[in-house]
Amino acid sequence: MRSIKSILGSDLIERETEVGPGTYIRYLDVVVAFLRHLKTVAEAQSHSQLDHVVLGRPVFFVDDDPVRDAKAQAALEFAARAVGFTDVVFQYEPIAAALDFEATTVSEELVLVIDVGGGTSDFSLVRVGPQHRDQLERKNDILANHGVHTAGTDFDRQVELASVLHELGYKAKGPDGQAVPAMTYFDLATWHLINTLYNPVRVNELRLMRYFYADEIYHRRLMKVVTERLGHELAARAEAAKIAVAAGGETTIDLACIEAGLMPTFNEQQLVTVVDQEVQRIVAAARETVRLSGVAVERINTLYFTGGSTGLRLLSNALSECFPSARAVRGDRFASVATGLGIHASRLYGDMACN
């Protein structure tokens, strides 16, 4: 599973997915099972029953749709209560990251929290400082929140299309010179849709597409991936390639599982090219956050980067260029939000909060 919260804001939440021959489960029940596992492990570690929970949430589960956004939070709250939590509190993830950063400050400053994960990019402009640490009510210190449903999985999708799926016929030509249908490749590059390609009806449809290809090697490779259910493996290799070139350089993607000797290369410049639109959308969301606050760009002291996708040099550089007077601070990409949620929980519940 990846970017599991993304399902909350989609129409898929009440739909079912096949988890074995003839066995189906609702996506919402997957979320419930995930939370139940977390609760069980946490209770075993703490040797106590946990009834209260602080859950992080993106600024927007769904872009530009307050009704669906509210439904997404309601679905997550339902899942939390279904596993036994009786008191459920939500906190914006970038606000949680700001609380983590605040623990290190020695003076008051304005920080733009940049939290780019797998499913969403979230931003908060927050006033932080040692004099604020013990305050539970921070409404006046939160100057703006904003976010966009574009992040790491969108990068992965573009990388897979441009590298791995290019070797399977994405943008290949047919006998008439026209490009082969792209929908199959879009589905193969979209994590939660990969399983749909394994449906027997869909597999038969793909077999009939053999004559759509001028070079049948692409069709053979595609059918091997579908019949041997290699879709998620390819997605993981595309993600690994993205990570490998995130700080520069070149990598090789081993696709021997499809065909011996099939090893396309991928480099940072290709990454820059294929994710440009996604990066620009994220940068625009950061700018909009500051605009909503009414604060001059020059007054921002710090950019606090957290979330796994901020490890991409091209993204962090693009964001830093927008705010040249601010220093860049990198938090724990995978734990800042969780640490901040713990801080918030300790302020809400005091001794009841579990370390």
Roles of regions detected by a PLM:
Residues R26-L35, Q91, A151-V159, L271, ...:
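Phosphate/oxyanion-binding active-site loops and adjacent basic polyanion-contact surfaces
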Residues V83-Q91, E298, N317-I343:
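Conserved phosphate-binding/catalytic loops in two-lobed NTP-binding clefts
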Residues V128-C257:
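Phosphate-binding glycine-rich/basic clefts of nucleotide- and phosphate-handling proteins
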Residues A75-E102, D115-L125, Q131-L161, L165-H166, ...:
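Small-residue (GG/TT-enriched) beta-loop-alpha framework at ligand/catalytic clefts
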Residues M1-V113, H132-Q135, R210, A214-P264:
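Nucleotide/phosphate-binding catalytic cleft detector across ATP-hydrolyzing
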Residues P58, V113-D122, A151-G152, A238, ...:
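A short acidic Gly-Thr/Ser loop motif
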Residues M352-A353:
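Membrane-embedded alpha-helical bundles of multi-pass transporters/translocases
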Residues K39-V53, V283-N301:
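Phosphate/pyrophosphate-binding loops at sites that engage ATP/ADP/AMP, CoA/4′-phosphopantetheine
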